[in-house]
């Protein structure tokens, strides 16, 4: 509750300085082959705030230099998951949030928790919400919506990987997809990761409800950058167990020049994804 109030206070204080939300494109084909336009590299989305770290550096930090590895993660959800998150926002948060704000609240909270753990390593996650609607970003017509013919996570991720490979080639970046099914069975895979050249990772997670999926998402993100599976499944991150792998990913994949995977921020900072407040007026963007 206290953390939520702090994020809300920061959001209100800095609201005047935040840029407009990114405009959304409705078609994967309209996006550049590099996955992002050049001017987007190395820039924080408007919902991400920086907090300078002034304490002593941890001995397991990935670098002794005064910079932070920022890792960009783009998220994409099927419509049912979007609606479920938006519907759950009122009883869980006590607020009526617009669709995009509800998604930001859900993933922003996840990112803030991840970043609190990764701060020891000098690494931080940046959530990107462009194209957060999966159906507007990729072709889902071939998906088995019944989830009775093929394993949904494996089948959809395979199809998605091929589509992204055709468009982005070897510059996919890090992308997390949340898939949905009308019902769940114990035989389904709940998460899967596919790797591409240039450190690309395409992740798929099956929606299992807000709380269970939250744990799966955190575990999948950490596996994508560490190679260690089933992290966070007991509610905590064993940083000492994975720090060398995460640091290896950062040093190999996050360069001095901003790129599709992320960039080095020239300061020691912790990133905070500002959690939206209930809003009764128009933000000036379309959902």
From Swiss-Prot:
Signal peptide: 1-19
Subcellular location: Cytoplasm; Spore wall; Spore polar tube
GO aspect biological process, one term: cell adhesion
Disulfide bonds: none
Principal location: cytoplasm
GO CC, alphabetical: cytoplasm; polar tube; spore wall
Keywords: Cell adhesion, Cytoplasm, Signal
UniProt subunit comment: Interacts with SWP9.
Protein role: Involved in adherence of spores to the host cell surface and in infection efficiency.
Family: Belongs to the SWP7 family.
Identification of the protein by name: Spore wall protein 7
Gene: SWP7
